[in-house]
Amino acid sequence: MARRPRHSIYSSDEDDEDIEMCDHDYDGLLPKSGKRHLGKTRWTREEDEKLKKLVEQNGTDDWKVIANYLPNRTDVQCQHRWQKVLNPELIKGPWTKEEDQRVIELVQKYGPKRWSVIAKHLKGRIGKQCRERWHNHLNPEVKKTSWTEEEDRIIYQAHKRLGNRWAEIAKLLPGRTDNAIKNHWNSTMRRKVEQEGYLQESSKASQPAVTTSFQKNSHLMGFTHAPPSAQLPPAGQPSVNSDYPYYHISEAQNVSSHVPYPVALHVNIVNVPQPAAAAIQRHYNDEDPEKEKRIKELELLLMSTENELKGQQALPTQNHTCSYPGWHSTTIADHTRPHGDSAPVSCLEEHHSTPSLPADPGSLPEESASPARCMIFHQSTILDNVKNLLEFAETLQFIDSFLNTSNNHENLDLEMPSLTSTPLNGHKLTVTTPFHRDQTVKIQKENTIFRTPAIKRSILEGSPRTPTPFKHALTAQEIKYGPLKMLPQTPSHLVEDLQDEIKQESDESGIVAEFQENGQPLLKKIKQEVESPTDKAGNFFCSNHWEGDSLNTQLFTQASPVADMPNILTSSVLMTPVSEDEDNVLKAFTVPKSRSLASPLQPCNGAWESASCGKTDDQMTASGQSRKYVNAFSTRTLVM
């Protein structure tokens, strides 16, 4: 048989002995030829008889020789069949107290993993028998009590989600083995669940009633948790399930004011108390077997929300909205209902005092805490009302930041749901305001949130873009000096080209170019500065790019660093006349000339030289002692 996963600490499987054996399993299919079906069928009576004879003739030392006489059987299969089924010395009866005590002692010595070693100390028992005996009976952590209803419920829900993966289910029930859970399900629970409806009614009662029709939750609603004594508006009746304390306002209830900025928000942000957060966790935890069904219903609700907002160009409210800080009824058109009917829903009634929270937050239905119940509200009304409620300080902060964001982020919560461990497949529709917005439905592809965004071709093929400051500088340059000219590169005549450019700019600006300083050309002086020992990078640049074919003279003359102290940035050749405003700016970047040395170098003082160079009496004595100590040893080669 195929191997089963071994993840539970109470698993009764072992990697070296997984094949279940029976004394006479001769009812299986006949062996099939081919490597694919090698050893996949049960042993026949003829194969067992032949294996017994071969063991009597050849012994149990070389199973490969025996396997040669049994087609479609390997040496390992022959060995396991003999040791676990056909061996006459194998004990298949009940375990004695002495054997149980021996197993306990050996497990304490070798641990609950080395079953082959443990089996060698028990004559007539194999490792699989010892393992199953320990996990099913002798392990002190294994529960031997009767099954409780809570354990049955866990098994029922886990089996609906995982199927016959008993090792995974055993992780949810500490103290129960996968084999015990499997036996309990097959012998008792499956019949009671399938035929008698066991645990099905209690499971439905414990789960929130979100399996209602699409008509009930496919609309935007402004609602609150109404106490049981609240009166429902006469215009309509509650929809499918009376557990919901909110009702839809019929389209006949017309109110006159105008809501300028309708925004879709999650209802639980506004009027769901904090204790209801636990209900949300129970709604959407990973163990919920109806999670997929809930997701589909939320997708349908989002589709309805989009259609309703598209149909609403102006959402009226009552005339005294600005004077009253509370909530008011709004007329919401539902275009998604198949028969045109409108299920009534109650909104918050008008009050001239601060609205009071429900007395019993725990009585709030779990359905009202769903993050997909949305509502339309007035911006100023929301801010004025929420500021009066200290219990909703966090709500105020969220709404204020939400309403002040750009229109591009109004549908952030609906377009970007929280990531789950499994990508959700569905069409998420955007919810936008009906004012100055494109009403085109935006459909997301499957698992779009987990995919790398596509790069536009224009970005890949476009030319490099010039930064804005450079654009302004180039524009000013073109206005002042004319359009830029692209000249061919002439590396061999670089010096001549630079001299021409400097001379041309100097002539245009009215300044005579000074090409000679102390009888030395300026460019040669520049190259000497770059060749200075303080700038090795300039040395590399000049040696590679300033060597011209036409330069036949020695360009790099030996010059002292003091002679090159004036900086080329202060030279008048490179400075063009500028206006007074520009001159003030450029002065900040002008490097001042280096100050010359005040006086020539003077000889050091004798006392200072003796102290700094180690010529004092103490230093001379220490140096002499060190030399004597070192000279006492012979010269040795340093071995690394």
UniProtKB/Swiss-Prot annotation:
Region (Leucine-zipper): 375-396
Occurrences of domain HTH myb-type (ranges): 35-86, 87-142, 143-193
Annotated stretches, region: Negative regulatory domain: 328-464
Organism: Bos taurus (Bovine)
Posttranslational modification: SUMOylated by TRAF7; leading to MYB transcriptional activity inhibition.
Residues bearing the modification N6-acetyllysine: K471, K480
Domain notes: Comprised of 3 domains; an N-terminal DNA-binding domain, a centrally located transcriptional activation domain and a C-terminal domain involved in transcriptional repression.
Main location: nucleus
Domain of life: Eukaryota
Glycyl lysine isopeptide (Lys-Gly) (interchain with G-Cter in SUMO1) cross-link, chain position(s): K503, K527
Name used for this protein in its record: Transcriptional activator Myb
Annotated region (Interaction with HIPK2 and NLK), positions in chain: 90-193
Subcellular location as annotated: Nucleus
